[in-house]
Amino acid sequence: MRECISIHVGQAGVQIGNACWELYCLEHGIQPDGQMPSDKTIGGGDDSFNTFFSETGAGKHVPRAVFVDLEPTVVDEVRTGTYRQLFHPEQLITGKEDAASNYARGHYTIGKEIVDLVLDRIRKLADLCTGLQGFLIFHSFGGGTGSGFASLLMERLSVDYSKKSKLEFAIYPAPQVSTAVVEPYNSILTTHTTLEHSDCAFMVDNEAIYDICRRNLDIERPTYTNLNRLIGQIVSSITASLRFDGALNVDLTEFQTNLVPYPRIHFPLATYAPVISAEKAYHEQLSVAEITNACFEPANQMVKCDPRHGKYMACCMLYRGDVVPKDVNAAIATIKTKRTIQFVDWCPTGFKVGINYQPPTVVPGGDLAKVQRAVCMLSNTTAIAEAWARLVHKFDLMYAKWAFVHWYVGEGMEEGEFSEAREDLAALEKDCEEVGVDSVEAEAEEGEAY
């Protein structure tokens, strides 16, 4: 088996975890108490969903997941919620005091006390796997636990499981909607620390998701539940190929192979289509061509940046539902003829396709319509540099005035770490830009073409 262990860190990670596991259970027909009436093999079995769930002798399915937060309130909601019987109590780990939006508290002072316990739990989960494939780590960039503790944990995982892939789902601080003043500090420190430990990081920007909820689902004031359910759909699309049998299946390591041209440039954009409310879906025919086109609309992206200003390095299309390869090839051929979508000249083919026959499931009473087919596009584009540039700019504004720095230094950080992290991100931004520059011959030709 190729098992995956999900690690949900901090409030954002835990709440997205709730949305994801709720959806996985619906998709696989697993009840909130872990029983699965459709599953005939008791204990183990080689079903695809066993990559995400382990089975006990009593036929109960337990998620291969750990929920960690440095303060108890958010995880307590899982302990008392609908799915409380699904998780083993030891999978829900909480500390006593929170990281107070402070990277240094999550990474140095408070995180240190709990990290060995967490690694011990992860070790127990890993022991239940026959062929552990890797880790999926869910966290936010802006929070103290999400930034500090997640990066500490990833450093330690690199030591203990050096050969296993680590994929992140990270909540990028939204340009407008800010939950903490020090988000730029936390984001830049955590990106710097995890850059060499993460193999692939899917970023999700709250503001982009807000806009999608407002525009496509007509929700005037989206709540975190609305946002998380949409993020859950995306995570589910990305992991569907690991949990179901499909025609063209995509493995965790295959993502990396196809999406990451250089080790540092491992931040693909996710785009999901169709995001549509039930009353609209009733009147629309969402063909493969239409949903494929929708993926190239900047409005449907999960991070605010404009791919039309950058170039695509690689592109993964993950279809699910009633989709046949013939339609996909036609849709992609059409996309390639469009001038607006530019690929870097050293990567001419650039499309990888996965098809999964399991149609998308929706949470009953949720906002999304039940559709026959959906697609999730993961694209590595140089436009992501815009997102880093925004962060670095905000970081500079505060750091120039040395604002809030004492909170970090007081928790045992050194001032040098700030400038070091800032340099690293500036370099990352530069890397993205350089990759997009054409080879010399191409530049001469372009001059003539215009």
Swiss-Prot record:
SUPFAM superfamilies: Tubulin C-terminal domain-like, Tubulin nucleotide-binding domain-like. Keywords: Acetylation, Cytoplasm, Cytoskeleton, GTP-binding, Hydrolase, Magnesium, Metal-binding, Methylation, Microtubule, Nitration, Nucleotide-binding, Phosphoprotein. GTP binds at residues 11, 71, 140, 144-145, 179, 206, 228. Some glutamate residues at the C-terminus are polyglutamylated, resulting in polyglutamate chains on the gamma-carboxyl group. Polyglutamylation plays a key role in microtubule severing by spastin (SPAST). SPAST preferentially recognizes and acts on microtubules decorated with short polyglutamate tails: severing activity by SPAST increases as the number of glutamates per tubulin rises from one to eight, but decreases beyond this glutamylation threshold. Glutamylation is also involved in cilia motility. CDD domains: alpha_tubulin. It is found in: Cytoplasm, Cytoskeleton. The modification Phosphoserine is found at residue 439. It holds the Pfam family Tubulin_C. Signal peptide: none annotated. Mg(2+) binds at residue 71. The record marks 450 as: Involved in polymerization. GO terms for cellular component: cilium; cytoplasm; microtubule; microtubule cytoskeleton; nucleus. Its cofactor is Mg(2+). One of its GO terms (biological process) is microtubule cytoskeleton organization. It catalyses: GTP + H2O = GDP + phosphate + H(+). The modification 3'-nitrotyrosine is found at residues 282, 450. Dimer of alpha and beta chains. A typical microtubule is a hollow water-filled tube with an outer diameter of 25 nm and an inner diameter of 15 nM. Alpha-beta heterodimers associate head-to-tail to form protofilaments running lengthwise along the microtubule wall with the beta-tubulin subunit facing the microtubule plus end conferring a structural polarity. Microtubules usually have 13 protofilaments but different protofilament numbers can be found in some organisms and specialized cells. The MREC motif may be critical for tubulin autoregulation. This is Tubulin alpha-3E chain. It comes from Homo sapiens. The gene is TUBA3E.
